[in-house]
Amino acid sequence: MSGGEASITGRTAPELNASAAPLDDERELGETVAATALLLAIILVTIVGNSLVIISVFTYRPLRSVQNFFVVSLAVADLTVALFVLPLNVAYRLLNQWLLGSYLCQMWLTCDILCCTSSILNLCVIALDRYWAITDPINYAQKRTIRRVNTMIAAVWALSLVISVPPLLGWNDWPAQFTEDTPCTLTQERLFVVYSSSGSFFIPLIIMSVVYAKIFFATKRRLRERTRKLGTLAVPAPPQRTSSRPLAELESVASQEDETEPSPEPEPLSSRADKPANGISVHQFIEEKQRISLSKERKAARVLGVIMGVFVVCWLPFFLMYAIVPFCTNCAPPSQRVVDFVTWLGYVNSSLNPIIYTIYNKDFRTAFSRLLRCDRRMS
């Protein structure tokens, strides 16, 4: 076969191998350049997106609410991932070796666990906050004070430290001697893997799944109730129910069933002034408020699916690999490409969080637009 190939091509097998080597090198170089460009783009999007979230909450008045402190904490966690974890990961993959020594390797890995864990735990706290706001809006509105929110945020970061620091205190299987050829990887000490994966992902995943399921079913129940109310509102109001109450009072009555939702855009004063103060207009006004609320709750139910779906898709592959590999001694270890892919898939969640948690919010979109246009009317 080799002689036939040489006579057809006019080149021997060694010559063919030598000519194929540059092609392989060029292909590998192209893949490296493309992958690096993609990873740098992810870092840039993560930094810009989360920075916009933080600046918007502190500079745009409609966003200066207590519940948005949770979103700021999430954005800070995701921003630290982009600033302190991802750049070193890119450099490590490009050089294919760790050149910064044992101490910086351990600090980098600890920072990785800390930042990613705090991001996931912030998602969990946001889920709990939404659950309490929907299921017990009146009481929770009184309990949701700045002090309580700050305490919850501090607890998230403290728990993240408790989960991430033990390897620095000796709970690890890192080699005693560290050279340039020593890989800088997370410890595979089995008890710590169980401890950290449970606290960082699996327990928050269970909590978020239960909470979002309860939110979803509570939302469906409220949708059914409001649909029935709309059916009763469809009956024309009798003449004797004519009312001349001020519009502000009517808004208060109509919004009693919608206390946990943001208010719709206010109508121009001219259009308000044109409304007759009779029973028919009151009926139409309340019906419209109910329809707006129904639309918002349907949208909120869809957003819940997006939030949970993206979180699971991004982080589940990594934590399955992280939790299984140390215990499967007879299994073939995953390739470096697989490890890199599932690791960066988890990191991508930090770039998607500001998009998911803000793209459905008109106030955030307005704040982003004004910031990007350098509009001074932010406050």
Swiss-Prot record:
Recorded GO molecular functions are:
octopamine receptor activity
Q: Could you confirm whether the keyword Transmembrane helix appears in this record?
A: yes
Spans within the Extracellular topological domain = 5-36, 91-107, 172-196, 326-340
Which residues are listed as membrane-spanning?
A: 37-58, 69-90, 108-128, 149-171, 197-218, 304-325, 341-362
Q: Which domain of life is it from?
A: Eukaryota
Instruction: Name where it's found.
Output: Cell membrane
SUPFAM superfamilies attached here? Family A G protein-coupled receptor-like
> Would you tell me the Gene Ontology cellular component terms?
plasma membrane
Q: Which residue positions carry a glycan here? A: N17
Q: Where is this region: Disordered?
A: 234-276
Cystine crosslinks: C105-C184
Principal location class = membrane
Say which family it is in: Belongs to the G-protein coupled receptor 1 family.
What name goes with this protein? Probable G-protein coupled receptor No18
Organism listed in the record: Amphibalanus amphitrite
